[in-house]
Amino acid sequence: EHDAITTYDDPCDIIEMPEIHRGVAVAYCDSPGPFETAELTTFYAVSPTPADWDESRVASFYREYNGHMLHNLTVHEAMPGHVLQLQHDRRSPRVTKARAAFMSGVFVEGWAVYAEEFMVSRGYAPRAAADRERAALAIRLQQLKMQLRMTINAILDVRVHSRGMTEDEGMRLMQVRGHQEEGEAVGKWRRALLTSTQLSTYFVGYVGVRDLVADVRAAHPSWTDRQVHDAVLAHGSVSPRHLRTLLGL
C-alpha cells in the first residue's frame, strides 16, 4: 500500500513462549531452518512474567511493555522486522551453504532496529486507534526509549564481561539513565550474565544497516523505499560490511 517493502503471505503464528525457552529474552522470532524446503510456520513467541515474581514486579514489567511498546516490539520481531527479513532470506540465492547456515546476528538485529525507526518515521499507528496522530507520537516515544535501551545494551554487554560491572551498577544504569522499569532491568541483567556479545548486536547492527540504507539511497536517488529495502534484503543475512560489496557500494 505504501510501497515500502515487498511482503509475503507465509504463515506466522503468535504464541506464548514455551517454558524451556524463557528466562533470556522477552520475545523472539523462530523461523524455519535455512535448508528447510517445506512451507513451515514462523513463530513469534512472547514470554509471560515468571511465576515467582511478586505483584509489584509483574506490574513494573507491564508498565514497561505497555500497549504502545508492544506495537514497537511487534515491528521489531515480526513486520517488517525479523519475520519479514527472514522471509526474504529464505528466498535469497543460496550462493554457499555457509552463508545460508551462519546468519549475521549484527545484520538480523540491525535490520529489526532499523525497521522500528523506519516505521515511526512514516507515522505508523494502529488503524483501530481513536486518535491515530496521538498514537503515532506515543509509539515514536517508545521507539526512542528503545533506541536508548539499545545503546545501554551494548554498554552493559561490554562492562559486564570486561569491566567487572556489578549488579547494582547495571541496575542503576538501566533504571536511572535508561528510564527502564525494574521488571525489565532485572530480566536484562540476567540476560547479560547468560550471554555475551549478543546484546551489542542491536547497536552495532543498527548503525551498520542505517548507514548502508542511506548509501543505497544516495547511489540510487530515484529508487522507492521498496526498491531500496528489497535490494538490502536480497542477499540473505549478510553482515553489513560484506553486504556493501555485494551491493556495489
How would you label these PLM feature ranges?
Residues 1-249:
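Long, His/Glu/Asp-enriched segments that create or flank divalent metal/ion-associated functional microenvironments
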